Swiss-Prot record:
pH dependence: Optimum pH is 6.25.
Thermoactivity: Optimum temperature is 25 degrees Celsius.
Chain's gene name: UGT71K2
The keyword Magnesium belongs to this UniProt entry's keyword annotation: no
Source species of the chain: Pyrus communis
EC number, UniProt record: 2.4.1.-
Highest rank taxon of the organism: Eukaryota
Gene Ontology molecular function, alphabetical: UDP-glucosyltransferase activity
Gene3D superfamilies: Glycogen Phosphorylase B
Record family assignment: Belongs to the UDP-glycosyltransferase family.
Protein's UniProt name: UDP-glycosyltransferase 71K2
Keyword terms of this UniProt record: Glycosyltransferase, Transferase
PROSITE patterns in alphabetical order: UDPGT
Group of enzyme by EC: transferase
Amino acid sequence: MKKVELVFIPSPGAGHLVPTLQFAKRLIDRNDRISITILAIQSYFPTTLSSYTKSIAASEPRIRFIDVPQPQDRPPQEMYKSPAKFFSLYIESQVPSVKKIITNLVSSSANSSDSIRVAALVVDLFCVSMIDVAKELNIPSYLFLTSNAGYLAFMLHLPIVNEKNQIAVEESDPEWSIPGIVHPVPPRVFPVALTDGRCSAYIKLASRFRETRGIIVNTFVELETHAITLFSTDDGIPPVYPVGPVIDMDDGQAHSNLDQAQRDRIIKWLDDQPQKSVVFLCFGSMGSFRAEQVKEIALGLEQSGQRFLWSLRMPSPIGTVPCDCSNLEEVLPDGFLERTNGKKGLICGWAPQVEILAHSATGGFLSHCGWNSILESLWHGVPITTWPMYAEQQLNAFRMARELGMALEMRLDYKRGSADVVGADEIERAVVGVMEKDSEVRKKVEEMGKMARKAVKDGGSSFASVGRFIEDVIGENSGFK
């Protein structure tokens, strides 16, 4: 039997790259005919992911990385004020280099005695411009969406609305009825790019989805039954493969800036806490707060009386990753550290999120509602309180709280950089609510965690979906069997 090569083009950010590599590992584990080539687009901004990709390359001989050369003409950093437009232009600037690399791969496979064929190009949300390369080289293209089925429904709906009436979204506009999402969606929870006056780039991305051979989504049928059922009955939508949860169970590798001593300090402190007694606060790789908001969070935690583990990070210049706080006493209320740190709570910088959510002492999660974080919390049965920041997190928070009933609603429409300060009393209520021992939300989350684990096992819905994707790529229809 002939072997096949799948070429993945992920976005360089951790939230996109890590699940892409985990899915690649899942594919090679399932079928020994598959090898994976990752075209590594370098991040415009400094990251800590190089050691993670090196560890994958060293441990997985059928996954290799090819670095895409940096283009000479890159979009200016000021454009990062509109991330969707910035990333789209940055990725588009890579197209000539990517085309050259893939052309060489196709040529090499055609001349190789090993009978390895380039079977498909798998692109990220921000890399849909690479679909043109696949078309030119007559290679099927697939989209790997690191977000969820509800977000996919939203993106598929955007071009339809735009064709009827040029979109100019205001937060005060009427709610939208979106096929695949149960409740009408208020524009205030739309992805930030659509409500900041710069939505054309977002619509351009969404308009390419239907050009692919199929769409792989990091979700599972049991979690998003409504949306996935709709996709399966709409002939105008490419086949959808719900393959999740695709999560990294060893997230320490992905963030080498977390030193072992800090990890050990965190886990040792958790080991000393009662079961399900700690609320974990973490807001993603780009989540941070100004000093006045930090003080309110601290006061809310103290008022709640709950034990807490707080990953506290401070804003950095635009386009760079938030940094750990160098002087906690400057941003926290007077005496807060003396009263709480190491006793009722622990404040840290970057934290091993998966390991913390898996710990028996963790009972709740105050989260930015990034999709990877949501999947990790469901996997470990830890309920979330919503505090979205950016990207599609507001939509995620809305659906988790209002549609799925698996999160407690604190804020749904908060946006990073907002002048709005969430007060201590509101934070106190949210923390106390998420830590309630016998809440309906906790019961639902724990039950969905069990379903998530079944979904990825042999006989599960996502296991079957991965098999269907493999068959569609290398089976009879693609001519590589």
